[in-house]
Amino acid sequence: MTQALLCMSHSPLLDHATPPAEVKSAVDDAFARARDFVEAFDPELVVNFGPDHFNGFFYDLMPPFCIGYRAHGTGDYDSFAGDLDVPEDVAADLAQFVLDHGSDVAISRHMEVDHGAVQPMEILHGGDAGARPILPVFVNSIARPFVPMSRVRAFGHAVGDFFAGTDKRVLFLGSGGLSHDPPVPQFATATASQREFLTSGRNPPPEARPARQARTIETARRFAAGEAEIMDLNPEWDRAFLDVCRSGRVEDFDRYTADEMDAAAGHSSHEVRTWVAAYSALRACGEYDVTYEFYRPIKEYIAGFAVTTAQLAGEA
């Protein structure tokens, strides 16, 4: 088995919220299943399709896709803060291959990755996001304008094509979603100070990030209590998306539009773009089977929370 997939939701609230014990136990079990899958596969490289939450990417320059040649964690929400083990030569070869095959991608020689990318790595490796070689691939999932989902699929397919002939064990990792609408300012309706942050907030004053995080934690508390004025989770939408993942018909992702996603599943549901890229990458390597699926709508985490694993057909 040379390619496999793990897609999972993340939440900065994992260590800052208290869901019912049964829910927490179910999530922990899903994480354990994911760890077992990854340990058995033992990837030599993790291609990490991750979003960002205005910690590393801002409107001063917001690409739809970006491949990191070097990267480090931002440490938001007490997540991993440090250098990641990125094979720069592989990153450079991948970027050129993707460009040569019709997908426009930016590159970064100093990528900052936040909890959205590093949290799954921490969960899988006992808190050490740098435990395995990682190739960080940013997929814009929060900042309009968005490319059509067909472009995300094509980008993921190109990444998969690059690795299809390798003899290395490569794990495609997608992080984010599913339905959720946390308190992230939208540029169109933001205040002047919020717009300034969304554009050039890369080096905020020391008190700014804790204040942002405290607002999110408080919103989660109020949301779980039925008091927060944010969009509810949408389990029906989530399950329909998981159905497409399971079907192997990645072209069906093309029907998802940005406006529909905002209206049905919340402004941050666009994080499923990382899943679309990851599943499309695996499909480029061959037909696949989803081997595990977990889903719960969890208000304490402000997320329709899912974990899936997949491997190429016939490689069980």
UniProtKB/Swiss-Prot annotation:
GO terms for biological process: 3-phenylpropionate catabolic process. It is an enzyme of class 1 (oxidoreductase). The keyword Cell membrane does not apply. GO terms for molecular function: 3-carboxyethylcatechol 2,3-dioxygenase activity; ferrous iron binding. Pathway: Aromatic compound metabolism; 3-phenylpropanoate degradation. It comes from the Bacteria. Catalyzes the non-heme iron(II)-dependent oxidative cleavage of 2,3-dihydroxyphenylpropionic acid and 2,3-dihydroxicinnamic acid into 2-hydroxy-6-ketononadienedioate and 2-hydroxy-6-ketononatrienedioate, respectively. This is 2,3-dihydroxyphenylpropionate/2,3-dihydroxicinnamic acid 1,2-dioxygenase. It comes from Rhodococcus rhodochrous. The gene is mhpB.
